[in-house]
Each structure stands twice: as C-alpha cells, then as structure tokens.
Amino acid sequence: MGKVRTKIVKRTARELLEKYPNLFTRDFEHNKKVVSKLIETKSKKLRNQIAGYITHLVGIKLKRQIQA
C-alpha cells in the first residue's frame, strides 16, 4: 500500500508550489533545504513529508510536460 499524507502536508506543498514554482526540483535534498527556508516546521518529519510530496508533484508535472 502507498503512503498516506495528511491534509496539512498536501495543502502546504501545493501552496508552496503555487507561490514558488521555480524553486523546486526533482531532488529531495534540495527541496528539503528550500522548504526549511520558506516555512518554520515544528518537526523534521513534517518538513521531510512536505518536501517529499513536493518532489512527487514536480515529478508528475515534468512527466506531463514530456507527454504533451
């Protein structure tokens, strides 16, 4: 089964991607650093979940661009 992400993770990731679309890449480590600069998270786990979901969304976006 896949990983379940909470609303806060999905909402925050989508908001960050909308505001700063050019800051994120398919590299998780890079996205993790960018997320930590943009928002203050209460825990590393939450920061990593947001960065991971952003990485996932960027990958989907790139695949769609290639297919189009």
Swiss-Prot record:
Domain of life the protein comes from: Archaea
UniProt-listed InterPro entries: Ribosomal_eS17 (IPR001210), Ribosomal_eS17_sf (IPR036401)
GO biological process terms, semicolon-separated: translation
GO cellular component: ribonucleoprotein complex; ribosome
GO terms, molecular function: structural constituent of ribosome
Keyword field: Ribonucleoprotein, Ribosomal protein
Family: Belongs to the eukaryotic ribosomal protein eS17 family.
Protein name (database record): Small ribosomal subunit protein eS17
Lineage, uppermost ranks: Archaea, Thermoproteota, Thermoprotei, Desulfurococcales, Desulfurococcaceae
Gene assigned in the entry: rps17e
